[in-house]
Swiss-Prot record:
Originating organism: Oryza sativa subsp. japonica
Motif (Modulates binding affinity to PYR/PYL/RCAR abscisic acid intracellular receptors): 264-268
Domain of life where this protein originates: Eukaryota
Ranges annotated as spanning the membrane: none
Protein name in the entry: Protein phosphatase 2C 50
Binding site for Mn(2+) 2: 118, 306, 368
Function: Protein phosphatase involved in abscisic acid (ABA) signaling. Together with PYL3 and SAPK10, may form an ABA signaling module involved in stress response.
Keyword Hydrolase included in the entry's annotation: yes
Molecular function GO terms recorded: metal ion binding; protein serine/threonine phosphatase activity
Length: 387
């Protein structure tokens, strides 16, 4: 599988990067197969149309990142095409898959990962997340996949919660030095922490496949789906003054203090993160997860650190990204170039959108690092058949 060889596309200080998989139009016209659309999907399959679950699409994207007005660059990002194969039973019910004539136990969908990690106190944890989250997530998906055959009907949301929670907790344990390993003679040695106890990072991650987008968020980076002309927030910022977050912190004996904004113990301006072991158990690495079926009018995803979101609204970001992508294709043609391998090339349309958003945040006075990933979800070439 190409995921084994794929490395994360990294945006460092004042650099931009973009890589491409494949694009496509939904063959046969089935944009998504959801529980509420079972009859239509079955009818389409009977008419000779191909299910979205038999499509392989690596989305195209662009990434832009800058230190901005900050003294240090503490953001990191990752784009990893085909990092894992997802059991289709995590995306649809056995009943629906059987109705489509698909093997519910054997079928896997190629998945692609995008992530933004906004560090604080240093870049070490953000950089560690960039290198490790997709690896650990792939391992957790394989672990779950081995057990799916023994399960009955699967609660998709429950299993995705479990997969991402274990992934983020494992990375947090590694960062904090809470991992033990067996040495010669059978003894155990605890690993060293990656960095100081006051260093941490947000993590917002999107897993994209042909049928769904699955999002996990921990912290105050954000992901927004541009669906048609409307922004759809796929994450909710973890701020200490959020009612449920404040209640959780105070139930653990912690305090939320107003000190140049609401902060945990008067220090950290977010209520969840990876790292920050000096603020445990008040600051936790548990992500909130959302599973979203893809739709025909999905335009793009925007993942970004708060250097963008502090000065640009969801509505403006979607409007700008959509306009820049359309403008590029209007001036240069409908299709973006593809590499011979189907991944690893640049996508100038998505890159133009990411660059523009980064410059817009600077123009609006953002004082933080800014990292933006724009994932173009609009199909422009035929999808590859994986059946």
């Amino acid at each position: 599988m190409a995921a084994a060889a794929a490395a994360a596309a990294i945006c460092g200080e004042d650099e931009t990067a973009a890589r491409v998989g494949c694009t496509g139009e939904w063959a046969g016209g089935i944009e998504r197969v959801d529980l509420g659309e079972r009859k239509e999907a079955v009818a389409a399959a009977g008419a000779g149309k191909r299910s979205v679950y038999l499509m392989d699409c690596a989305p195209v994207w662009g990434c832009a990142s800058t230190r901005g007005r900050s003294a240090e660059m503490e953001d990191a990002s990752a784009a990893v095409p085909r990092f894992a194969d997802v059991p289709v039973r995590l995306l649809a019910s056995r009943r629906d898959l059987d109705a489509l004539g698909l093997d519910a136990d054997a079928l896997r969908l190629p998945a692609h990962l995008f992530g933004v990690f906004d560090g604080h106190g240093g870049a070490e944890v953000a950089n560690y997340c960039r290198e490790r989250i997709h690896v650990v997530l792939s391992e957790e998906l394989k672990r779950l996949g081995k057990n799916l055959g023994e399960m009955g009907e699967v609660d998709m949301k429950e299993h995705w919660d479990d997969v991402f929670t274990k992934c983020f907790q494992r990375v947090d344990d590694e960062v904090s030095g809470r991992v033990t390993r067996v040495v010669n003679g059978g003894g155990e040695v605890r690993s060293e922490p990656v960095t100081a106890e006051n260093v941490g990072s947000t993590a917002v991650v999107a897993l994209v496949c042909s049928s769904h987008v699955v999002v996990a968020n921990c912290g105050d980076s954000r992901i927004v789906l541009c669906r048609g002309k409307e922004p759809v927030a796929l994450s909710i910022d973890h701020k200490p003054d959020r009612k449920d977050e404040r209640a959780r912190i105070e139930a653990q004996g912690g305090k939320v203090i107003q000190w140049n904004g609401y902060r945990v113990s008067g220090i950290l301006a977010m209520s969840r993160s990876i790292g920050d072991r000096y603020l445990k158990p008040f600051v936790i690495p548990k992500p909130e997860v959302m599973v979203v079926p893809r739709a025909k009018d999905d335009d793009c995803l925007i993942l970004a650190s708060d250097g963008l979101w502090d000065v640009v609204s969801n509505e403006e970001a979607c409007k700008v990204a959509r306009r820049q992508i359309l403008l590029w294709h209007k001036n240069n043609g409908a299709a973006s170039p593809l590499s011979d391998e189907g991944e690893g090339s640049t996508d100038p349309a998505a890159q133009a959108a990411a660059d523009y958003l980064m410059r817009l945040a600077l123009k609006k006075g953002s004082e933080d690092n800014i990292t933006v990933i724009v994932v173009d979800l609009k199909p422009r070439k035929k999808l590859k058949n994986i059946s």
